[in-house]
UniProtKB/Swiss-Prot annotation:
Function: Forms part of the ribosomal stalk which helps the ribosome interact with GTP-bound translation factors.
Entry keyword annotation includes Ribonucleoprotein: yes
Protein name (record): Large ribosomal subunit protein uL11
Top-level taxon: Bacteria
Length: 142
């Protein structure tokens, strides 16, 4: 077995799927670790081609020899909730002004999508996490 590569850094970014380019925030974040920026952009865009337009968080592991690997995460719960509710943004005063309503079924569906990234043991616990996010955005869960 080949010797393990030493990890030089871990970079977490949220980039719109299929639209990674060397401009900020991608370029500077990768540049300071010495990663080939264009190589990452091409690989990321190819991997996220099917989800164009959605924000996809990515965790990039940079090794000492300047090579890298990346893991794609599920879209942020807030973005999924906004899409489900059909609104552009959450409430400025979430506990005073409510901007939209989502059903428990929609919340469970989002929890199913996010379950790999959530720190929950079952779907009910994951749904409660998503419902909490909705509440803090001024979205009512019914």
């Amino acid at each position: 077995m080949a010797p393990k590569k030493k990890v030089a850094g871990l970079i977490k970014l949220q980039i719109v799927a299929g639209q990674a380019n060397p401009a900020p925030p991608v370029g500077p974040a990768l540049g300071q670790h010495g990663v080939n920026i264009m190589e990452f952009c091409k690989a990321y865009n190819a991997a996220t081609e099917s989800q164009r337009g959605t924000v996809i968080p990515v965790e990039i592991t940079v090794y000492e020899d300047r090579s890298f690997t990346f893991a794609l995460k599920t879209p942020p719960a807030a973005k999924l909730l906004l899409k489900a509710a059909g609104v552009a943004k959450g409430s400025a005063e979430p506990h005073k002004t409510k901007v939209a309503k989502v059903t428990w079924d929609q919340v469970r569906e989002i929890a199913e999508t996010k379950k790999t990234d959530l720190n929950a043991n079952d779907i009910d616990a994951a749904a409660k996490i998503i419902a909490g996010t909705a509440r803090s955005m001024g979205i009512t869960v019914e």
